[in-house]
């Protein structure tokens, strides 16, 4: 055996052998139960950073553990490779996005292989390749056929830096999710998916093992609210409409309406604005278009508006109500119109105070004295100034007012959602082309399935303007109508890259299949994903879209399940000097350098040891060095000669107890994904074994069996050194094809326990006792303890509480 462990040499040797043997190739023919382990695939930015490793390594450890537990594990890998960065690189460096992307794929593939993960490389997918995006386009056509894809003109989020449209989910605090530039609004013809059709299903996570914070974020994103749609009478000579509808969650306050506010984008604004108010209204609309939705909805921003000059009539009491416009109202939510009840809504109260609008109290607090309110009253109370509902508790009034409105044809109960349809159009080149054409005679026509994929042209001119480069490529744009054979033009927008990642987990089940997006038989075997790991930042984007996509495919009869991921786990982040790593801060840790310095296994073990996986931890170079030294000590433990002397029964019992306790702890902790304590337990075991080895009191057979068990538990954490140690023990290749060790409860029991003795809950003594002590013996020993007796003098024991094997609490008075 080698005297000193050489991680780089050993790791390269085993990685090459595993690859040559296709050790981690997953087959559907296995008699074992399946386990689909998946980590969110990386975007092809060019280099893996330590955050990628932190996402992959613990997930790989668990996948390896499941393999040893007898599961048929599939752990595929691929690359999310369409997107704006590639196009920006093309503009900046004068390189084609395809070349830039595939160069990055090659580098990242090399880096991923150094992780030593049990990736099944036969299943690799790359979303920018035609053999993949052909099926992305096929899914678009299926959604179109099902009425779930449509084209409409709508105000959209626009990033002036990226020169691209953003979905609502891609605007974070009023800025672009990618470059953090403040976004604005534009009106464009866009393609949408009717994700709102699935609002109720998407807020329901029953049967899923997902973090509560993610399910809460998705429920809040759907934003389901119950209320009423109420119509106010409109009598305006310049509008043929005879009413304006509002959505309200407070129908019990209908008698307190003193104004109405329309969104600046509301289609009635232009029609109802009087000539004398037109200039002010137009100026306000222009100003509002420079604000993002986040800014418009901000609770810290002062609410303002402009009067249109027109009134509507509140039908329940005949009151005339002025109609204003205000940018805090969004056309995309509800009806784009809200009723103002300043007495019972804080926002409306501030608006009314600012513009000297009336405040009418219609819900009375118990101590109400009839005086004007100084602040909005938003709690429960009794209705007043409310016609036939005076004296009615407002909690009952909500239902009664809804019934009253419905009886008179003035309104109805309704449910509203904050969720908007998914905007998928992008005015960029590097994405999957939308497979639609425009014919003057036939209108909008889908590309026939037989003509897929619609390929991206190679000869494009990249520009930094806000229009797709495809728009200026005549060879791409000009085509033939599939219906009439006449001249037609292709859609020049490409799809949101989240479209590609909404189904990649399905493709992994049969990536080489060419008769459809996946082989139905293999899909049925592998799906759904058993454990999906990745960042929480994808809660209302990738994770949300993937669930919609899966449910839509189910309803189309393409698949027979409605949820893609059974269990979801979000890892934390690794920080440096308490700061998130970034190039600008100069604190990015590059895995390539670490592997060259200490080897893959040391990096793997340290990442799992640094902190709870869901919380992350602080990167520390000295900690990594310490992990490297520990692996060297493990190597020495195995390779330094052991010559047993006279076997000791006591030492043998201690060895078995320590070993079986460790098997139990590691098994339970790894099942809970507590990898930091798994590594800690391995360290403790190695220290215990080193001490026992010095006694030379363990038989050669037991020592050999112990080392085998240790290697098996080490294998998921540090697979390379474990494989080498296993081979050095003369065991059958490969350690990763063996069975996980089991523990014996009897052997794991302590012979001696530490019993805590309390008097009235205060610690008075710790006693070393035999592990099998009875309750009566424990109580008697506690009462007779020399340290306890002084605390019992002059007092009468009321009761003695015994917690088996842990504590005796004597209650006295």
Swiss-Prot record:
This is Leucine--tRNA ligase. Keywords: Aminoacyl-tRNA synthetase, ATP-binding, Cytoplasm, Ligase, Nucleotide-binding, Protein biosynthesis. HAMAP family: Leu_tRNA_synth_B. Belongs to the class-I aminoacyl-tRNA synthetase family. A motif ('HIGH' region) lies at residues 42-52. GO terms for cellular component: cytosol. The keyword Aminoacyl-tRNA synthetase applies. It is found in: Cytoplasm. NCBIfam families: leuS_bact. It catalyses: tRNA(Leu) + L-leucine + ATP = L-leucyl-tRNA(Leu) + AMP + diphosphate. GO terms for molecular function: aminoacyl-tRNA deacylase activity; ATP binding; leucine-tRNA ligase activity.
